[in-house]
């Protein structure tokens, strides 16, 4: 693609995303489906603005690559070892069972048995990009079903390697004298990557971080991700698997959070590009010609995968309320099918329009997943938010709560327990189905669903409540909820959780003055106890704590987020000197007056 054409394509992608995604969000169908529809609109079968879909689709796989790197950063080797049963048990069972059933059906549809095997394996895979994005949107990351879903996706990525190796064997084009030397060299190169990454990555990033230039650190992070992807691609392995391993190798390093922050903006844009590219690849001509065949194929594919996943979730012990979410979020075909079917086509395994039909089926199945998840959410909301079926009265009898607590993680639990202990009428909103079921057993008045939906807030009593306490894990959800409350429920007194100074600045800029940084108060309290243990009088330690809190808050309100680390360091040094002067004056005052305080703990 020429430079001018590439620039034009970039402008079209951005325009399509900016136009389609907000519209999709307003219609309530989700950002992923918005990207897919945008791709259909600008692709060769829509308005025809872009025709070179294959090249763009290959480039857009970088979105999945960046996503897998961030996932790897969140998992250390010990955590992966804990997931071994679900990865190689449930994951393997899902691929084998789904592939066997789907291959049998393809043989009944006049596919050669070799093509049916490849088709069954390709259709058995799910979309890593779509599933992880939807799991994040639906708050499944912390749930048991979300962890199991990730394990299944990870096994599918591992299964890419033998699946691609199987294609030439099925086509009968494999060399009679298997090149063991080439295989051994690939294994050796993979081992070198693991060992080298284990012992070299941290010293390299330590050297780069010492330069103090943020842009160089970001460039080094991009270099690592793209190099790992290119290296694995050269070995004939999954690019996403390579970057996932690189992320795991750095999961226990001190640079984990900085690496994640550097990659996150690129991941979001490239994932959007990936979904747009998938939409562009939808062959509407084949769809029109074989409409009934394709429609039946999509339904059969989704139903078979959902039944398989639901059965495995039940055998694994997942709660009944979470099984439907788990089964539906992995029910689509995946991006790996494009690679596998293209490889099989080059080996002449498919006949006529068979490959085109399979690709259309995969693409449409990906489009059904957001709608299916939305339907599952509505069903769960009616089931979990309806009237109590038993005769026991809930702890909260008043339909008009004083406070709405959004999120019932460790942070939200403490707040809710304190409010309930003081006889406050509260309602809790939570997206984790397991947490909802547990809370209801203990008599909490709780609603399941996404708190960023206006109707759910109304059902929870937002129009009559006095305050809302936002304890979301994701800062994006917090800011979205703040804007929603300010627009639709301006009478609510908003109190929020901030994960750090960046989120605190965002809340202040949005007009929220009542917030708590999740580690700040506990760290201050432990610091006060440390001062007392070193011989400082409890009263003096308490005053030191209050001074520090007051000065830090003043800095927080007055310090605009700076891009320069040196400016931040300079401001911090000034604040430290000011704090030392305050403490010196306090100590002189303490010596002049007798203090009657005693330790009261």
From Swiss-Prot:
Entry's Gene Ontology molecular function annotations: glutathione-regulated potassium exporter activity
Subcellular location: Cell inner membrane
Residue ranges constituting the RCK N-terminal domain according to the UniProt record: 400-519
GO biological process, one term: proton transmembrane transport
Coarse class of the protein's main subcellular location: membrane
Annotated membrane topology: Multi-pass membrane protein
Keyword terms, alphabetized: Antiport, Cell inner membrane, Cell membrane, Ion transport, Membrane, Potassium, Potassium transport, Transmembrane, Transmembrane helix, Transport
Pfam families per the UniProt record, alphabetical: Na_H_Exchanger (PF00999), TrkA_N (PF02254)
Domain of life assignment: Bacteria
GO cellular component: plasma membrane
Sequence intervals crossing the membrane: 4-24, 29-49, 55-75, 87-107, 111-131, 152-172, 177-197, 207-227, 230-250, 262-282, 284-304, 324-344, 356-376
Subunit structure: Interacts with the regulatory subunit KefG.
Protein's job: Pore-forming subunit of a potassium efflux system that confers protection against electrophiles. Catalyzes K(+)/H(+) antiport.
Listed NCBIfam families: 2a37 (TIGR00932), PRK03659.1 (NF002973)
Homology family: Belongs to the monovalent cation:proton antiporter 2 (CPA2) transporter (TC 2.A.37) family. KefB subfamily.
Protein name: Glutathione-regulated potassium-efflux system protein KefB
Source organism (scientific name): Salmonella paratyphi A (strain AKU_12601)
């Amino acid at each position: 693609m020429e430079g001018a054409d590439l620039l034009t394509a970039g402008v079209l992608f951005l325009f399509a995303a900016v136009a389609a995604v907000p519209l999709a969000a307003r219609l309530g169908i989700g950002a992923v489906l918005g990207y897919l529809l945008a791709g259909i609109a600008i692709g060769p079968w829509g308005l025809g603005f872009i025709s070179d879909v294959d090249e763009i689709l290959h480039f857009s796989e970088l979105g999945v690559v960046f996503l897998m790197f961030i996932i790897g950063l969140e998992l250390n080797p010990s955590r992966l070892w804990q997931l071994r049963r679900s990865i190689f048990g449930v994951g393997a069972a899902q691929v084998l069972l789904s592939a066997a059933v789907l291959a049998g059906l393809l043989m009944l549809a006049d596919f050669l048995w070799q093509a049916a095997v490849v088709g069954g394996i390709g259709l058995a895979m799910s979309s890593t990009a779509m599933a992880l994005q939807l799991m994040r949107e639906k708050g499944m990351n912390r749930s048991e079903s979300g962890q199991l879903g990730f394990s299944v996706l990870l096994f599918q990525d591992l299964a890419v390697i033998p699946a691609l190796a199987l294609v030439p064997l099925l086509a009968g084009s494999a060399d009679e004298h298997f090149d063991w030397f080439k295989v051994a060299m690939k294994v050796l190169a993979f081992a070198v990557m693991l060992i080298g990454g284990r012992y070299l990555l941290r010293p390299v990033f330590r050297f780069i971080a010492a330069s103090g230039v943020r842009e160089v650190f970001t460039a080094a992070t991009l270099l690592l991700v793209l190099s790992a992807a290119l290296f694995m691609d050269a070995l004939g392995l999954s690019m996403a698997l390579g970057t996932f391993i690189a992320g795991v190798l750095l999961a226990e390093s001190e640079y984990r959070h900085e690496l994640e922050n550097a990659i996150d903006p690129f991941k979001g844009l490239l994932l959007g590009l990936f979904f747009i590219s998938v939409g562009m690849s939808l062959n509407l001509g084949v769809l029109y010609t074989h409409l009934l065949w394709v429609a039946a194929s999509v339904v059969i594919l989704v139903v078979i995968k959902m039944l398989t996943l639901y059965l495995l979730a039940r055998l694994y012990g997942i709660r009944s309320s979470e099984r439907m979410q788990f089964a539906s979020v992995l029910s689509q075909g995946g991006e790996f099918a494009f690679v596998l079917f293209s490889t099989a086509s080059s080996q002449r395994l498919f006949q006529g329009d068979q490959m085109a039909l399979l690709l259309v089926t995969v693409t449409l199945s990906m489009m059904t997943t957001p709608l299916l998840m939305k339907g599952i959410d509505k069903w769960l909301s009616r089931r979990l938010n309806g009237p109590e079926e038993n005769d026991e009265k809930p702890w909260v009898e008043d339909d008009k709560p004083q406070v709405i607590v959004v999120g019932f993680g460790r942070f939200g639990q403490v707040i809710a327990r304190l409010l309930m202990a003081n006889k406050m009428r509260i309602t809790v909103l939570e997206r984790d189905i397991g947490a909802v079921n547990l809370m209801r057993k203990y008599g909490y008045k709780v609603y399941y669903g996404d708190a960023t939906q206006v109707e759910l807030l109304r059902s929870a009593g937002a129009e009559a409540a006095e305050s809302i306490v936002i304890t979301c894990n994701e800062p994006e959800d917090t800011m979205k909820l703040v804007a929603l409350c300010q627009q639709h429920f301006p009478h609510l007194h908003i109190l929020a959780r901030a994960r750090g100074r960046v989120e605190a600045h965002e809340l202040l800029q949005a007009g929220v003055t009542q917030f708590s940084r999740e580690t700040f108060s506990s760290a201050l309290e432990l610091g006060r106890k440390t001062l007392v243990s070193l011989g400082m009088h409890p009263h003096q330690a308490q005053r030191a704590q209050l001074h520090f809190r007051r000065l830090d808050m003043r800095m927080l309100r007055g310090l605009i987020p700076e891009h320069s680390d040196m400016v931040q360091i300079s401001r911090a040094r000034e604040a430290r000197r000011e704090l030392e002067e305050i403490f010196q004056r306090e100590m002189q005052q303490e010596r002049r007056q007798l203090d009657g305080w005693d330790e009261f703990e």
